[in-house]
A protein has these predicted regions:
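Short polybasic/polar patches that bind polyanions
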Residues: 15, 26, 55
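A generic structured-segment signal
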Residues: 13, 34-38, 46-48
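A short, Lys/Arg-rich alpha-helix, primarily the initiator
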Residues: 1-19, 66
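Short alpha-helical DNA-recognition segment
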Residues: 19-40
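Residue-level detection of the helix-turn-helix DNA-binding "recognition helix"
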Residues: 40-42, 69
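Short, charged recognition helix plus adjacent turn
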Residues: 55, 63-93
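Short glycine-/polar-rich loops that comprise or flank the Walker A/P-loop
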Residues: 59
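Short, basic-rich loop-to-helix N-cap that marks the start of a DNA-contacting helix
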Residues: 42-55
Length: 93
């Protein structure tokens, strides 16, 4: 399963609402440098950033953190999933 990086999702939500990255930075007090690396797919969304985005955009911080976790798991599965399946045997009960 291929999931979009949260930066793409954030950028899309902002575009739909006509909110610039600069405005998001000013009104959430998230540094512009952090927003820039998030929307460019170079950094994950932290719990604090999720709280700030949820407060500003509405909804729950859990949505942002859950999407981030799903993305991270998908990336890790592509990177090392086969190796883990070979190295780790299921526990026998």
């Amino acid at each position: 399963m291929r999931l979009s990086h949260l930066g793409k999702i954030l950028k899309s939500k902002l575009a739909d609402r006509g909110i610039s990255l600069n405005k998001l930075s000013r009104e959430t007090r998230i540094p512009m440098s952090r927003i820039s690396v998030i929307v460019n797919g170079k950094r994950a969304i932290t719990a604090e950033t999720a709280l700030r985005l949820a407060r500003y955009l509405g909804g729950s911080a859990n949505v942002w953190t859950n999407l981030q976790a799903q993305h991270d798991l998908a990336v890790t599965m592509r990177r090392v999933g086969k190796l883990i399946n070979r190295e780790v045997m299921r526990a026998v009960t």
